[in-house]
Each structure stands twice: as structure tokens, then as C-alpha cells.
């Protein structure tokens, strides 16, 4: 009798564990699905599209047919540009750019262009012809489409433009207008005035409204707040209000907002993901304003700083308590603090890698005299395709470009252990690690189905994902 009771309890426990496992997997799938269906583009991309300068305006159907019959077609599978047809000049090469999917079977179609955030397994240009090269533009962090950050998925593409320095067109400096923006002293406040302002301001400012991202930054900042005062203006850990006229995300680049932040000695610059070369305005903004960024994000950020002593690197401190003690030390000692501002006062950017990246890139940021990075991406693919067209006319040998895992790669997200085990934190914070693990299976399933080279359904895709568990 005892054995039967024990056996019954054992099977009930097993059933309960299996049920919890399925529940967790279902939650991960739901959350990933939300990101998979995400339709909103970053404001940066939207603004860039408004600035696009086409060689020719959209033409009548008859003229479009004439153009596409004479030039290689670059088909945007993601409707990023919104252009039904445009002839683009790329140096001495010319290509026809369109979002019209009816051109997929056209013999002049040579490249399919994807925007990573919109890359969706629901509809892919399959079967993939041997003459079709795939190109990926993805400037975002992994939270927008995790599956692309694994070797089986990223290597499906021939051409890439990502935040990684290893991609074919690196976008590492995408949030920096230029070297002059770093050197500018328009918002610089003297240390003497900042010391006076400290009577009503905390030493640190934090501005985030995207809470509980893969980097788990809010957990770290929450712990840091136990040891040093932080003025938090965003929705995350909010404790201080901005003036009503700038209390909107659209005002993040407003001069009044910059004047407010420029009054702080230190600004917390925490990325939403920890990936090499993934560096955003969170780093560049305090550097441009003359504040000291307290940075957490790209492990190799020192490769991109304007000076060896221009930012405080969070990863160098074993605990937020130690970081707080160091910031307090600088806050009380003007001589030590000014060592982090010296480069700014003298306009001395001595990082050769940063200087080269800015001066040699083929695109500009908020600069109407230069191509934007989407134009540059289109032209990179266009030039490569045209080069192969010429090589094929001369003989059978053509160039083959391929992405490798370094073109888009991030480690698994980790959470900080400062919080108690049963702390009532959001489920989003706990979701990123299982999402990352599942995305490995998704990347593998995607690769398998694409190599099969015929259309597939979402049911087939998810069945294969579960098969890989």
C-alpha cells in the first residue's frame, strides 16, 4: 500500500514537472513571437528613409520595366525603403532597387535584401536560386531577432551590415555623427558649476524606459542605488521627473534635454545587450555632453573610446558597492575627475581605430552631404553583384562572399545575482536566457529548412524546433 502511494506521488510529481517545462517553453515562444512580429522600426531607420535621395523618382510601369530589363535588380524582401522601383547609381555601377516581390522570378534579380528586425520565417524567397545572393542589414541588438545571432542562421547570408566590426559593412559607429560631435563643447559645464549643481542633483543620471532587457541593467542600477544617489528620469527605476516639455522619448535629441544631462558629472550608460562592438548613443551621448559615462555593455568598448581615460568601465568593479565608492572618490576630487574630461577640453581624440572608423566609413549620420548607411549598404551589394556580372562575362570565375559567425554574434544573456531568489521581478527578466537557448534551435531549424530549398510552413518550422530540444 505504501509503495502504491509513493508511486502515485512520484508520477504526479513527474507530471507536474513536465507541465511546468511545457509552460515555460510556451511562454518563451509567445514572447519570441511578439518580437518576431515586431513591425515598428527604430526611429533612426525611419528618419534615414525620409532623407533618401533617389537617382530617379518612382517611374511609370513602362519605364520601370525598361530599367529592370537593363540593370541588376536588388529586391528588398523587407519593405524597409517603401520604394516600388528606383534606379540607384553606385559609383560607376547602376542597380534597380524595389520592394515589389513579383520581381523574385525575374532573371535580372541578383540579390535579396533583408532587414534583420523584419526577418520572418513566415515567408522567405524560396526556393533560393543559385543566382540569388542574400544580404542582411541589421543594426539592432539580439533582442530584436535572436535567431540571427547564431552560426547556422547568419551564414545563410552572402553580404552583411551589422554592428560588428567583422561584418562586410560595420555599423559600429552608427550612433556617432562624427569626430567633431565628440570634440564639441556646446553642452560642456565646468566642474566648478557642476559642484554647485550637486546641491540639487545626484552625481549620477540614469535615463532608460526599456526595462529589463537582456543585459539586466536595471538590476545592477537598483543595487548601485543602495550605495550612491542616482537621478533616474526614465520609466525604469523612475525617481525624478524631466520638465514637461522634454518628458517624451522623441525629445532625447533635444538641446534642452542635453542641457539637463550636461549638468551631471556622471551618466550611467548601460546597453540593452552585452555584445562586442554593440555601442549605442548611451555611450556617445555623455561623451558629447562632457559628462563621464559609467559604461556597461560591449566588452571591447575600450577599442572605441576617444581616450584611454574617458569612461568608467563597470566590468572592472567586482560589485556595485565598489563602483559607487570609486565614483564618490572622483566626485569629491576635482583633479581626479578632470582626468576623464581632459581629452574633451583639448579636443584630443587619440584612438586611431575610432578616427579611422569615422573618417573611412562610406556613409554619414544626419549628414545630407553623405549617403546614409542604408544607401551605402545597397551600393555595397550592388557593386559586388555588378562586379560578378562583369566577371561572368569574361569567364566562369566569379567572387563568392559569405558571412561567418563573427558577423553577428553575442553570448548568452546573464542576470545579476544581487536580488533575492524570490524577488518579485518581471518575467521578462527571466525570459532572455531560455529565449537565447531556444533561438539556437530556431537557427538550426531555419538552416535545415532553407537548405531543403522549398517553401515551408510555420508548423513545419516549430515541429523541427521541438525536435531539436
Swiss-Prot record:
GO-annotated biological processes? fucosylation; positive regulation of protein secretion
Q: What class of enzyme is it?
A: transferase
Q: Which InterPro entries match?
A: Alpha-1_3-FUT_met, Glyco_tran_10_C, Glyco_tran_10_N, Glyco_trans_10, GT10-like_C_sf
- Quote the pathway field: Protein modification; protein glycosylation
Q: Which UniProt keywords apply?
A: Disulfide bond, Endoplasmic reticulum, Glycoprotein, Glycosyltransferase, Membrane, Signal-anchor, Transferase, Transmembrane, Transmembrane helix
- Where, subcellularly, is it found? Endoplasmic reticulum membrane
Cysteine disulfide links = 379-382
So where does this one cross the membrane? 10-30
Q: What is its EC number?
A: 2.4.1.221
Cytoplasmic side, ranges: 1-9
**Sugar-bearing residues?**
100, 158, 308, 333, 455
In terms of superkingdom, the source organism counts as Eukaryota
Q: Which GO terms describe its molecular function?
A: alpha-(1->3)-fucosyltransferase activity; peptide-O-fucosyltransferase activity
The catalysed reaction is:
L-threonyl-[protein] + GDP-beta-L-fucose = 3-O-(alpha-L-fucosyl)-L-threonyl-[protein] + GDP + H(+); L-seryl-[protein] + GDP-beta-L-fucose = 3-O-(alpha-L-fucosyl)-L-seryl-[protein] + GDP + H(+)
Q: What does this protein do?
A: Protein O-fucosyltransferase that specifically catalyzes O-fucosylation of serine or threonine residues in EMI domains of target proteins. Attaches fucose through an O-glycosidic linkage. O-fucosylation of EMI domain-containing proteins may be required for facilitating protein folding and secretion.
Tell me which family the UniProt entry assigns to this protein.
Answer: Belongs to the glycosyltransferase 10 family.
Q: Under what name is this protein listed?
A: GDP-fucose protein O-fucosyltransferase 3
Organism (species): Xenopus laevis
Q: Which gene encodes it?
A: fut10
Amino acid at each position: 500500500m505504501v509503495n502504491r502511494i509513493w508511486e502515485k506521488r512520484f508520477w504526479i510529481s513527474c507530471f507536474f514537472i513536465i507541465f511546468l517545462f511545457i509552460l515555460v517553453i510556451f511562454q518563451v515562444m509567445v514572447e519570441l513571437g511578439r518580437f518576431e512580429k515586431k513591425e515598428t522600426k527604430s526611429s533612426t531607420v525611419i528618419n534615414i528613409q525620409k532623407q533618401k535621395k533617389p537617382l530617379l523618382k518612382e517611374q511609370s510601369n513602362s519605364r520601370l520595366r525598361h530599367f529592370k530589363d537593363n540593370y541588376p535588380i536588388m529586391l528588398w524582401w523587407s519593405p524597409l525603403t517603401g520604394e516600388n522601383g528606383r534606379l540607384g547609381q553606385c559609383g560607376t555601377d547602376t542597380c534597380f532597387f524595389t520592394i515589389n516581390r513579383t520581381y523574385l522570378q525575374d532573371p535580372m534579380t541578383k540579390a535579396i535584401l533583408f532587414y534583420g528586425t523584419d526577418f520572418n520565417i513566415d515567408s522567405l524567397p524560396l526556393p533560393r536560386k543559385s543566382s540569388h545572393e542574400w544580404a542582411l542589414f541589421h543594426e539592432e541588438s539580439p533582442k530584436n531577432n535572436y535567431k540571427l545571432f547564431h552560426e547556422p542562421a547568419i551564414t545563410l547570408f552572402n553580404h552583411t551590415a551589422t554592428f560588428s566590426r567583422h561584418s562586410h559593412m560595420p555599423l559600429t559607429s552608427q550612433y556617432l555623427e562624427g569626430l567633431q560631435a565628440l570634440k564639441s563643447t556646446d553642452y560642456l559645464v565646468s566642474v566648478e558649476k557642476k559642484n554647485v549643481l550637486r546641491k540639487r542633483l545626484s552625481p549620477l543620471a540614469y535615463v532608460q524606459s526599456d526595462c529589463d532587457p537582456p543585459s539586466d541593467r536595471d538590476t545592477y542600477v537598483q543595487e548601485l542605488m543602495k550605495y550612491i544617489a542616482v537621478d533616474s528620469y526614465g520609466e525604469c527605476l523612475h525617481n525624478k521627473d524631466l520638465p514637461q516639455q522634454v518628458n517624451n522619448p522623441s525629445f532625447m535629441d533635444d538641446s534642452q534635454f542635453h542641457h539637463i544631462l550636461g549638468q551631471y558629472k556622471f551618466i550611467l550608460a548601460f546597453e540593452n545587450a552585452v555584445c562586442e562592438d554593440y555601442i549605442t548613443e548611451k555611450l556617445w551621448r555623455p561623451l558629447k555632453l562632457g559628462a563621464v559615462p559609467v559604461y556597461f555593455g560591449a566588452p571591447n568598448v575600450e577599442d572605441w573610446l576617444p581616450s584611454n581615460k574617458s569612461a568608467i568601465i563597470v566590468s572592472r568593479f567586482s560589485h556595485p558597492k565598489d563602483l559607487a565608492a570609486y565614483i564618490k572618490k572622483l566626485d569629491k576630487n576635482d583633479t581626479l575627475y578632470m582626468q576623464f574630461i581632459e581629452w574633451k577640453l583639448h579636443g584630443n581624440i587619440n584612438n586611431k581605430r575610432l578616427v579611422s572608423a569615422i573618417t573611412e566609413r562610406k556613409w554619414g549620420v544626419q549628414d545630407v552631404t553623405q549617403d546614409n548607411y542604408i544607401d551605402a549598404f545597397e551600393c555595397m551589394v550592388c557593386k559586388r553583384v555588378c562586379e560578378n556580372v562583369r566577371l561572368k562575362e569574361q569567364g566562369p570565375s566569379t567572387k563568392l562572399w559569405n558571412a561567418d559567425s563573427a558577423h553577428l554574434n553575442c553570448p548568452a544573456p546573464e542576470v545579476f545575482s544581487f536580488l533575492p531568489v524570490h524577488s518579485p521581478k518581471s518575467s521578462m527578466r527571466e525570459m532572455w536566457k531560455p529565449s537565447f537557448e531556444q533561438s539556437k534551435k530556431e537557427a538550426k531549424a531555419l538552416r535545415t529548412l532553407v537548405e531543403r530549398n522549398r517553401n515551408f510552413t510555420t508548423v513545419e518550422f516549430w515541429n523541427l524546433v521541438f525536435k531539436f530540444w
